[in-house]
Structure formats: C-alpha cells, structure tokens
C-alpha cells in the first residue's frame, strides 16, 4: 500500500537561507529512489521559515529506505534537523 507523508518544518530564522541551499540536492536524490512516487517541497508565503514536504512512496518499506538513505542521513539528519525549531510528520491517506 502506498505511503503518503506530509512534513512541516519550521526553520530557525537565522538558518533559512542555508537550509534552502540544501533542498535541491535532497529533492534530486529522493526522486531517484526506486520506491519514490512523488516528492515536492513548498515554502509558506506567510512565513518563509516554514516548509511543507509532500512525499509519496510505493509502500512502507520504500519510505523506510528513504529515511535510511545516505542522502537523507547526510542532508536532513546532519545538516537540516539541528536548525529546525519544529518538525511535524503526518502519515496520511487520501480520502477523495
């Protein structure tokens, strides 16, 4: 069963510019994953320090493979997570 994930990041204001430079590589590598169906990153128009990541994977195993991937660990865990004020993850299912 497909896994759809919505993630909200609130970045420390002083770090937003730095974090934005890391996103193209993260998106490029994630989209190359065998189990990735969709991956997109959005920035709030009201608060540029807030990002929404929309991800879809073929199944739970593909989602876990993403979280364990070298690029996720290197970019998200090592370079982005330390600068987040807030991180909320929603695993959702499509209703309509």
What are these regions (language model features)?
Residues 27, 38-41:
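Short secondary-structure capping/turn segments at boundaries of alpha-helices and beta-strands
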Residues 3-10, 40-67:
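Short, well-ordered beta-strand segments in beta-rich or mixed alpha/beta enzyme
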Residues 34-37, 56-90:
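An amphipathic, aromatic/His-enriched active-site/gating alpha helix that lines ligand/cofactor pockets
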Residues 3-31:
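N-terminal first-folded block
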Residues 92-96:
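Short hydrophobic/aromatic patches at helix-to-coil boundaries
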Residues 14, 48, 71:
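Short alpha-helical
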Residues 1-3, 33, 49, 83:
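Residue-level preference for beta-strand/loop junctions
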């Amino acid at each position: 069963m497909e896994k759809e994930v919505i993630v909200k990041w609130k970045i420390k204001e002083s770090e937003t510019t730095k974090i934005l430079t890391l996103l193209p590589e993260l998106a490029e590598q994630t989209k190359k994953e065998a189990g990735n169906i969709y991956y997109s990153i959005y920035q709030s128009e009201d608060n540029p320090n807030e990002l929404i990541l929309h991800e879809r994977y073929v199944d739970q195993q593909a989602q876990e493979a993403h979280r364990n991937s070298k690029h996720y660990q290197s970019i998200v865990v090592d370079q982005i997570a330390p600068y987040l004020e807030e991180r909320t993850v929603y695993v959702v299912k499509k209703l309509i």
